[in-house]
C-alpha cells in the first residue's frame, strides 16, 4: 500500500502547525503566565462599540472572554444565552473524541470470506466490513483486493457484501435539508464509506467536466469511478471567452448526478465534490472493481449487497486508518462535517455499544458534565453544527476551551485549530483569509462556524501584552454576515 504521500501530507499538517505555534503563537501555561492586566476597560468599550453598531443591530449574540491562565471572565455579553453555534459545535466534538476515544484511536476495515475456497474459487460471499473510516480511499481498496488475490482466491461465486452494521442505518442528521443533500458538507454517514482524495470528504465523489470541441458535450468523469452513480451529461462546449455555467447536482433521493451548462474551449472546466446516496454500496462497488483489476472473476449472479458478516467468516485482509492524532488536522482545519458525525457515532459505539447519534451526543453531553460544566442552555441535534436547532451559550464553549488546556491531549487539539491569516490551507484552514493584519496574524487559534444568518468564532488569542485570552463569539439573525464584526472584536482583544 502506498502510504508515503499520505504520511508526507499529514506530516506537513503537523510540522507546519508546530512551526506556527512555536514561532508565532506560544501558549501561556503554568510558569509562563504573565500578570493579567488590571483593566479591560478599553477592550470592553471596543467590543461594545461593535455590538451596538448598525450592522449588528437585531443580531442575537452571546460573547465571553476569559483569561486563559485563571479562567477569570473579563468580558461577557449574554454569556448564558443559547445561540446556534454552527461549526463551533466541533469544539465539543473534537475535545470529547480526544477524551473518550483517545489520540491513538483508529478505524479498521476488514475483508472476510464466508464459504469454502477450493481450487481458488470462493464458494460464498466476500464481506467488506467497516467501522467508519473516513480516510478510506480507492488505493486502500486496491491494496485489500491485492491481499485477497494473494490469499489464493481467483474467483467468487457469491456477492460482494457491504457490512456497515457498526453504525445504525440513519444516514443523515435531522438538521440536513433536502437542498443540502447533494453538497459535500451534507454527506451521508455510514460505517463503510469512501473518500475520493486526501481532503477525506467521505461519502462523496469528485465530478469533473472538461471542454472538448466546440458544440460537443464536455468530458465528464467521476473519481473514483463507480457504477452506483449515473451521470446525465447535459453540457455543451462553447467558444473561448464565453462564461462557464456548468452546474453539478445529485437528484434528490437518487444516485443520478446531473451535469449541465456551457463550458468554454481551453478552459480548466469545473470540478466539484458531490455526495453519493448509499455510501456502503458505493464503497463495495469500487472494491468489486479493484478485485476485478487483480484478475478475480465473478459469477453472473454476483452483485453488491448489504448484510452483517457471519461470526465464522475468515479474515483475509485488514486496513487500519491513521490515528485520531492525525485525523484531527483535516477534521478541524477544514471543518469536515462527516468526520464530526462519524466521531459522534464512534463514541456512541465505544461507550454504549450503539453507533447512533443519540448515543454519541449523549457521550458528548456526559463528557462535558464530567469536567464540571453545566449543560444548562446546551441542546445538540448533531455533532457537526449543521442544525439550526443546536444551541450553546458562549460561556459553555469557553469553559470547554479552558478545561481542554488541562488535558494530556491538548497539544493535539491546539494544533488542529485554524491559525489566523496563515495562507496555507493546511495551517490556516478556514481562517487562512481572515485576521491577516500584523496584530492578529498567526496569533489567533480558533474554530470558525457559519450557517445562513449565523456566524461564530471560538478559540485562543495572544494579546499585544503577551497575555492569552480564551474567547467565544456566537451570533445569529445576521442580515448578511457577522464575520467582519467578529474579526473586529478579536482585534480589539489582541490589542489588549
Name the predicted role of every residue range.
Residues 71, 85-103, 160, 192, ...:
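Active-site SXXK
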Residues 41, 45-49, 92-99, 139-142, ...:
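Solvent-exposed, polar/charged alpha-helical surfaces in well-ordered, non-transmembrane soluble domains
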Residues 78-83, 273, 386-387:
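A short glycine/serine-rich beta->alpha loop
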Residues 51, 105-357, 362, 366-371:
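Conserved serine DD-peptidase/penicillin-binding transpeptidase domain
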Residues 59, 156, 339, 376, ...:
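Loop/turn elements at helix/coil->beta-strand transitions in domains of secreted/extracellular proteins
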Residues 1-35:
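Sec-dependent N-terminal signal peptides of Gram-positive bacterial secreted proteins and lipoproteins
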Residues 25-69, 75-81, 142-151:
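Beta-lactamase-like hydrolase cores
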Amino acid at each position: 500500500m502506498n502510504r508515503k504521500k499520505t504520511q508526507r501530507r499529514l506530516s506537513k499538517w503537523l510540522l507546519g502547525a508546530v512551526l506556527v505555534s512555536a514561532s508565532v503563537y506560544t501558549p501561556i501555561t503554568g510558569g509562563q503566565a504573565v500578570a493579567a492586566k488590571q483593566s479591560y476597560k478599553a477592550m470592553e468599550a471596543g467590543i461594545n462599540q461593535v455590538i451596538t453598531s448598525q450592522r449588528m443591530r437585531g443580531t442575537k449574540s452571546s460573547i465571553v472572554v476569559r483569561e486563559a491562565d485563571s479562567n477569570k471572565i473579563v468580558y461577557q455579553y449574554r454569556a448564558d444565552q443559547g445561540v446556534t453555534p454552527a461549526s463551533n459545535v466541533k469544539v465539543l466534538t473534537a475535545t470529547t473524541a480526544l477524551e473518550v476515544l483517545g489520540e491513538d484511536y483508529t478505524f479498521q476495515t476488514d475483508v472476510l470470506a464466508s464459504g469454502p475456497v477450493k481450487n481458488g474459487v470462493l464458494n460464498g460471499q466476500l464481506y467488506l466490513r467497516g467501522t467508519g473510516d473516513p480516510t478510506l480511499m480507492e488505493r486502500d481498496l486496491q491494496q485489500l483486493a491485492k491481499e485477497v488475490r494473494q490469499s489464493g482466491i481467483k474467483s467468487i461465486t457469491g456477492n460482494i457484501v457491504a457490512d456497515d452494521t457498526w453504525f445504525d442505518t440513519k444516514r443523515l442528521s435531522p438538521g440536513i435539508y433536502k437542498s443540502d443533500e447533494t453538497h459535500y458538507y451534507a454527506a451521508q454517514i455510514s460505517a463503510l464509506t469512501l473518500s475520493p482524495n486526501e481532503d477525506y470528504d467521505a461519502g462523496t465523489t469528485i465530478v469533473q467536466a472538461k471542454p472538448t470541441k466546440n458544440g460537443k458535450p464536455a468530458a465528464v468523469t467521476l473519481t473514483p469511478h463507480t457504477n452506483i452513480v449515473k451521470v446525465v451529461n447535459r453540457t455543451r462546449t462553447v467558444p473561448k471567452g464565453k462564461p462557464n455555467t456548468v452546474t453539478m447536482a445529485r437528484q434528490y433521493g437518487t444516485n443520478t448526478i446531473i451535469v449541465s451548462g456551457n463550458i468554454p474551449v481551453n478552459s480548466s472546466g469545473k470540478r466539484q465534490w458531490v455526495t453519493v446516496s448509499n455510501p456502503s454500496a458505493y464503497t463495495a462497488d469500487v472494491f468489486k472493481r479493484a478485485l476485478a483489476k487483480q484478475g478475480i472473476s465473478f459469477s453472473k449472479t454476483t452483485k453488491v449487497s448489504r448484510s452483517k458478516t457471519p461470526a465464522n467468516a475468515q479474515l483475509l485482509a485488514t486496513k487500519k486508518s491513521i490515528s485520531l492524532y492525525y485525523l484531527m488536522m483535516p477534521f478541524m482545519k477544514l471543518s469536515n462535517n462527516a468526520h464530526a458525525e462519524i466521531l459522534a457515532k464512534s463514541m456512541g459505539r465505544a461507550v454504549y455499544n450503539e453507533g447512533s447519534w443519540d448515543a454519541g451526543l449523549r457521550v458528548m453531553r456526559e463528557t462535558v458534565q464530567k469536567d464540571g460544566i453545566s449543560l444548562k442552555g446546551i441542546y445538540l441535534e448533531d455533532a457537526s453544527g449543521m442544525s439550526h436547532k443546536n444551541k450553546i451559550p458562549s460561556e459553555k464553549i469557553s469553559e470547554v476551551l479552558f478545561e481542554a488546556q488541562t488535558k494530556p491531549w491538548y497539544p493535539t487539539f491546539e494544533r488542529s485549530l485554524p491559525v489566523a491569516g496563515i495562507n496555507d490551507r493546511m495551517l490556516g484552514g478556514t481562517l487562512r483569509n481572515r485576521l491577516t493584519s500584523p496584530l492578529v496574524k498567526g496569533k489567533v487559534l480558533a474554530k470558525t462556524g457559519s450557517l445562513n444568518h449565523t456566524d461564530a468564532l471560538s478559540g485562543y488569542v495572544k494579546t499585544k501584552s503577551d497575555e492569552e485570552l480564551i474567547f467565544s463569539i456566537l451570533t445569529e439573525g445576521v442580515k448578511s454576515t457577522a464575520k467582519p464584526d467578529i474579526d473586529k472584536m478579536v482585534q480589539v482583544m489582541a490589542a489588549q
